[in-house]
Regions:
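N-terminal secretory signal peptides that target proteins for export/translocation
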Residues: 1-5
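Extended, histidine- and acidic-residue-enriched regions that form the cofactor-binding/catalytic faces
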Residues: 26-145, 149-261
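Bacterial N-terminal signal peptides
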Residues: 8-22
Length: 261
């Protein structure tokens, strides 16, 4: 953009922002992005929760391409909905719990070549998680349970490193709840400290797995957030049906993975 136009755009944005900050217009009522999470609590309420032995729950997702029919935040919607259900179950069992706002700047190697896929360096994510764990410990939490909605192996390895660091430092008892097929890919085993393996056995995966933005994820989004699914284009979409050797190329990501998709 030529300099005068760029200056005009900058000035226009700054002016608009100043006006909005001075007198924000009323907005239509809609669910808060912080609904059900620690962010809506006061510090007094949080202190009371930790004194009552509350456990912390944390969903770790990513902003990532999910085909032409699902939103970039698919991997955030799903684990958030799962933890909201977990909260309800824990409430029924009289277990005190606090849910953190979902993390969504993930490590994105597999789909990183697509527009909208935000890729964070693993060490940056690990350091951020380490700081969050330390802050939770200072707030009085003794345990935190993490889940992911984003199955990129590099993303999970960043989580694994953060969990191990927290447990070595004894800042907080950190736990990563991992589906068995993902745990197998990551080399995790039952009994590994800090890791809880759940779900079907690793060898239960079909020869042509429903990897990404397919029937499983689409069904989940239709169940928890139907308004964000572009249902009108779904009938025109064909599954990729990748063979095992193609899946390996896909998992390596970047341009080869994009082409095979």
């Amino acid at each position: 953009i030529e300099r005068p136009r760029k200056f005009a755009l900058t000035l226009g944005f700054a002016t608009a922002l100043a006006l909005c900050m001075a007198a924000p217009a009323p907005v239509a009522s809609s669910p808060s992005v912080f609904a059900g999470t620690m962010a809506e609590m006061t510090y007094i309420e949080l202190e009371a929760a930790t004194r009552n032995g509350a456990v912390a729950l944390w969903a770790l997702g990513a902003i990532e391409e999910h085909g032409p029919h699902l939103p970039l935040a698919t991997d955030v919607y799903v684990p958030t909905a799962q933890l909201l259900q977990v909260q309800q179950r824990l409430a029924q069992q009289k277990i005190s719990r606090v849910m953190l706002r979902a993390y969504y700047w993930g490590v994105n190697r597999v789909r990183g070549s697509f527009s909208g896929s935000i890729d964070i360096r693993p060490e940056v994510m690990t350091e951020l998680m380490t700081d969050v764990f330390r802050s939770l410990s200072k707030a009085g939490f003794k345990q935190v349970f993490c889940i992911t909605g984003h199955y990129d192996a590099a993303h999970s390895r960043a989580i694994i490193e953060a969990v191990r660091r927290a447990n070595r430092a004894a800042d907080i008892e950190a736990n990563y709840v991992v589906p068995n097929p993902l745990a197998f890919r990551l080399g995790l085993k039952v009994g590994d400290a800090g890791f809880i393996l759940v779900g079907p056995p690793a060898n239960a995966a079909p020869a042509r797995p429903d990897l990404h933005a397919g029937q499983a994820q689409t069904s989940l989004l239709l169940s928890i957030a139907p308004d964000v699914v572009r249902s009108e284009i779904m009938p025109s979409l064909k599954p990729t049906d990748l063979m095992p050797e193609e899946v390996e190329v896909w998992r390596n990501g970047y341009e080869p993975g994009k082409r095979i998709t």
